[in-house]
């Protein structure tokens, strides 16, 4: 650890120390740095060129052998330890015959031309990745069978920095649900709850493919790209925005979500529904998931007496039920404990790079169809309900059962969790828009036994209703009768 601290202190390039590091490389002619490097092809010069995140120098030539060995540099960039060298082209062009006549060597003049990466005196002499350059996904999936379901869930939580000891299964699932936007494409998650529950930890600390918008502030151009940006001269960020360059975009405080562009919410709704958006004359598609986080300043029961659970959103959103209908799952943040030292693990888990790369690679897979092997969704589901539940189910299954080896009861567990998250959205829509969203009794039917039909409820509203509004399962009935003490009571009979 002391060696690691020393290397980081001496070699890590801080943005405010870039010029000092450049000077040190120039003076010493060779120096080792730690920085994030990204490579791309310069098709006009037929070379690979590299740029650095913190070291403020012009693009340099990236040797082809490094790109072939570590292709990750071409897509997302990679943190590396690099041996940098400094020598000018003039130093290579000295007059080799000058010493024959006892004359001092004089550098030859360099032909005038536009300077390019080849002319940059900074060179990459050697390179070693300090994050996983590639992931053997099949190997990780193959290890799943060595763990029980509980052990695997605990491994995931410890890999994210949480200590699962003492947690109930439902609490563990809440923490796992926070990872679903990292592993599922075009997934829309909302989590509102008390302060201090670590809502932003996963997106800020665990995955380099997620970006956290502090205060929820952004612009339409930042989120979706500039209008009519030139394909040749604009960067990828300028053309497609955050949703085209990140796997997950998180709005850290929904109360601060304000857009000056009046069309921003319409663009956002279109993207949340289909993963596409238009900027000027061009149409783009992206697969970034969206997370909306915020605080609820009162108890859930008090909030529900006067308004709905989307109330922390700004007024321009609260008047738009179509926006909230596009949210796939509402995570009940009030059920998550406030972060304490005993909730932070000191046990081993997967290294952060491994967990984040696992999630990124698993985004390519689709597990939504696994519901159909065991259950059928009931008639209260509309298209958006089904999309939301299937994507939540798929994301949870990718995390907990990546080998696709799942039994009926485990499938029931994550299906009921997924339905509850979507029903919580619909219950708020029923409060906001009334009759349009009355079909809230989401549930499922056993594929082998159609008589086994179940409705899934949300905990915060079931507490206030003695007899649920939804149709009961066959063989279940509520009745009023006298007790042995001659008092009237409500009884539930189950056959």
Residue ranges with predicted function:
Residues 435-439, 443-477, 486:
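Terminal-proximal interaction/regulatory segments of ATP-powered molecular machines
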Residues 205-207, 353-357, 419-427:
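Eukaryote-specific, cytoplasm-facing alpha-helical/coiled-coil scaffolding segments in long proteins
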Residues 283-290, 295-400:
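Phosphate-sensing "switch" segment of ASCE/P-loop ATPases
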Residues 163-302, 307-311, 325, 447-460:
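Conserved ASCE/P-loop NTPase catalytic core
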Residues 341-343, 369-444:
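C-terminal helical "lid" subdomain and adjoining coupling/linker elements of P-loop NTPases
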Residues 16, 20, 32, 147, ...:
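Charged, alpha-helix-enriched surfaces in structured cytosolic catalytic cores
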Residues 482-495:
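Basic/aromatic-rich interaction segments and small domains that mediate binding to polyanionic partners
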Residues 1-160:
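Extended, charged/polar low-complexity intrinsically disordered regions
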């Amino acid at each position: 650890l002391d060696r690691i601290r020393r290397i980081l202190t001496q070699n890590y390039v801080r943005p405010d120390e870039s010029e000092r590091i450049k000077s040190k490389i120039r003076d010493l002619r060779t120096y080792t740095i730690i920085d994030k490097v990204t490579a791309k092809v310069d098709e006009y010069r037929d070379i690979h060129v590299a740029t650095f995140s913190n070291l403020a120098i012009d693009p340099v030539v990236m040797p082809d052998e490094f790109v072939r060995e570590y292709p990750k540099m071409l897509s997302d960039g990679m943190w590396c330890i690099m041996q940098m060298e400094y020598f000018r082209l003039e130093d290579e062009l000295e007059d080799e015959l000058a010493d024959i006549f006892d004359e001092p060597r004089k550098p030859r003049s360099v032909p005038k031309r536009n300077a390019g990466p080849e002319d940059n005196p900074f060179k990459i002499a050697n390179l070693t990745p300090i994050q996983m350059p590639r992931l053997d996904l099949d190997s990780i999936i193959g290890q799943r069978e060595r763990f029980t379901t509980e052990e695997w869930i605990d491994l995931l939580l410890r890999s994210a920095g949480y200590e699962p000891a003492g947690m109930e299964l439902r609490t563990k699932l809440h923490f796992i649900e926070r990872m679903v936007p990292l592993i599922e494409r075009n997934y829309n998650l909302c989590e509102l709850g008390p302060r201090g529950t670590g809502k932003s930890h996963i997106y800020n600390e665990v995955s380099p493919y997620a970006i956290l918008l502090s205060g929820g502030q952004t612009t339409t151009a930042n989120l979706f790209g500039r209008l009519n940006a030139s394909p040749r001269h604009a960067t990828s960020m300028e053309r497609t925005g955050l949703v085209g360059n990140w796997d997950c975009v998180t709005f850290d405080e929904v109360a601060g979500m304000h857009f000056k562009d009046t069309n921003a919410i319409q663009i956002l709704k279109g993207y949340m529904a289909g993963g596409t958006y238009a900027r000027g004359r061009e149409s783009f598609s992206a697969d970034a998931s969206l997370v909306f986080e915020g605080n609820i300043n009162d108890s859930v029961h008090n909030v529900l007496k006067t308004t709905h659970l989307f109330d922390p959103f700004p007024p321009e959103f609260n008047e738009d039920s179509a926006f909230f209908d596009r949210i796939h799952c509402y995570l009940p943040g009030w059920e998550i404990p406030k972060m304490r030292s005993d909730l932070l693990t000191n046990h081993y888990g997967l290294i952060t790079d491994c967990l984040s790369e696992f999630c990124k690679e698993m985004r390519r897979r689709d597990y939504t169809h696994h519901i159909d092997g065991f259950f059928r969704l009931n008639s209260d589901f509309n298209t958006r309900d089904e999309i939301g539940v299937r994507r939540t189910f798929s994301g949870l299954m990718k995390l907990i059962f990546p080998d696709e080896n799942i039994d009926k009861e485990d499938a029931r567990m994550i299906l009921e969790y997924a339905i509850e998250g979507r029903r919580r959205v619909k219950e708020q829509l029923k409060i906001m828009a009334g009759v349009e969203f009355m079909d809230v009794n989401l549930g499922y039917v056993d594929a082998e036994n159609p008589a086994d039909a179940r409705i899934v409820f949300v905990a915060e509203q079931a507490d206030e209703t003695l007899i649920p509004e939804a149709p009961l399962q066959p063989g279940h009935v509520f009745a009023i009768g006298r007790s042995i003490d001659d008092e009237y009571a409500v009884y539930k009979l189950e056959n």
